[in-house]
């Protein structure tokens, strides 16, 4: 599956999630299970067509995530800002989140 991570470089939670996903067991999980694609949404003014195409996962905050099947169907998408407080999530919590999706 493809994992879209929608975020922005100004976003502290996006930077925290990125760091967590690039180290330890989370990095191993993502490398094994997903093709990861980062989507820059700027100040909620970039790539909004991608956000719209997958049901507006950024509506409740960023970072947001969408998991797509090989035929581009949404398997999972954040809808309630599940990752919008990523800086307060433990590395284990982030790993478990992506392990569930």
Predicted feature residues:
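Non-catalytic, surface beta->alpha helical segment in thiol-disulfide oxidoreductase systems
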Residues: 59-101
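Loop/turn elements at helix/coil->beta-strand transitions in domains of secreted/extracellular proteins
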Residues: 1-3, 32-37, 62-63, 70-72
């Amino acid at each position: 599956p493809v994992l879209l991570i929608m975020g922005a470089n100004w976003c502290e939670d996006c930077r925290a999630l990125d760091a967590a996903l690039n180290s330890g067991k989370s990095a191993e999980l993502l490398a094994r299970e997903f093709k990861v694609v980062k989507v820059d949404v700027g100040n909620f003014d970039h790539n909004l067509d991608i956000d719209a195409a997958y049901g507006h996962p950024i509506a409740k905050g960023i970072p947001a995530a969408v998991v797509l099947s090989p035929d581009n169907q949404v398997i999972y998408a954040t809808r309630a800002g599940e990752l919008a407080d990523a800086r307060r999530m433990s590395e284990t919590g982030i790993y478990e989140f992506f392990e569930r999706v």
